[in-house]
Design a protein with these regions (language model features):
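Microtubule-binding structural modules
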Residues: 2-318
């Protein structure tokens, strides 16, 4: 005698759901996924968000189902279900801590080994990118950026044999133009750089050995010595960031926000002598992709949306 197939599937679904409602079990699950991703150069993780107030009031149905650690099924009305296989899929009940462990922890390890790294949140407008990256006011709601900064400075504090210098820069990309979010309002850097500089922030690529790599001319950097220093800069930058209301999000980010940390490490030993490594970590809160029909955008909002989609399309070229 064999079990009924639908009953088996229902049992498996309940077991998966139970694991996400048990914090300890969920973190063990995330830890196992983290170990599997440690040696992966590019990791794609999907975070499923719960229904928002607007969707609940409209009595919308959930369209996602987790079939396994890296498998997601999406069901759209009138269409056949589609299954996607990714590096990791995180349930809507997963806490912010789990997102950090999965997406940032292994990158921080590599940063201290001399590698560069990037963490960015991509998704439709209103999908929770800013919440995932920056988070809320409570400690338990802290996003990837504050948790990553705290881990970096905790690691530095414990490593007493090396000397570290950490610098931060923050840039906003709004309608395809760069803005230095660490520069005071109305500040003109031309006075410092000399009359030959036209005041524009430009992206450059230094391909020379030991060179800067990709960098921005004219942007300000600030030395940061602890997590609070960075979070104060993030808060100040967030206050300057362009946001606006659409039908899909009352506080829609209309620009991309890039926080870059440059971590320099000096080490002197009797055997190897003097060594110096420089690593860069970029953490990006992208503006959300959007359809004008869904957002109801017109005028300036419509132009912003077109610029957002144009820059996001560049991700598919690399």
């Amino acid at each position: 005698m064999t079990d009924n197939l639908p009953e088996i599937e229902e049992k498996e679904h309940r077991m998966r759901s139970a694991s996400y409602h048990n914090p300890d079990r969920l973190l063990r699950h995330v830890s196992s996924m983290h170990r599997a991703l440690t040696d992966t150069q590019v990791c794609v993780a999907v975070r499923v968000r719960p229904l928002n107030t607007r969707e609940i009031e409209a009595q919308s149905n959930k369209c996602t189902e987790l079939l396994g650690p890296g498998t997601l099924k999406i069901t759209t009305a009138g269409q056949d279900p589609k299954t996607f296989h990714l590096d990791a899929v995180v349930h809507e009940d997963a806490p912010q801590e789990a997102i950090f462990h999965l997406t940032a922890k292994h990158i921080i390890t590599k940063i201290f080994e001399g590698y560069n790294g990037t963490i960015f949140a991509y998704g439709q407008t209103g999908s929770g990118k800013t919440y995932s990256m920056i988070g809320g006011d409570e400690t338990s709601e802290e996003g990837v950026i504050p948790r990553t900064c705290r881990r970096i400075f905790d690691t530095i504090a414990k490593d007493t044999e090396k000397t570290y210098l950490v610098k931060a820069q923050m840039v906003e990309i709004y309608k395809e133009k760069l803005k230095d979010l660490l520069a005071p309002e109305g500040f003109d850097l031309r006075a410092e750089e000399g009359s030959k500089w036209n005041g524009k922030l430009l992206i450059r690529h230094d391909k020379s050995k030991g060179g800067k790599g990709i960098y921005i001319t004219g942007i300000r950097e600030k030395i940061v010595t602890n997590t609070k220093d960075v979070l104060d800069l993030v808060q100040s930058a967030t206050d300057k960031r362009v946001v606006g209301e659409t039908n899909m999000n009352s506080e829609s980010s209309r620009s991309h926000l890039v926080l870059s940390l440059t971590i320099s490490c000096q080490h002197v030993t009797d055997v190897e002598g003097y060594t110096r490594t420089v690593s860069k970590l970029h953490m990006v809160d992208l503006a959300g992709s959007e359809r004008a029909k869904a957002t109801g955008a017109t005028g300036a909002r419509l132009k912003e949306g077109a610029a957002i989609n144009k820059s996001l399309a560049a991700l598919g070229k690399y």
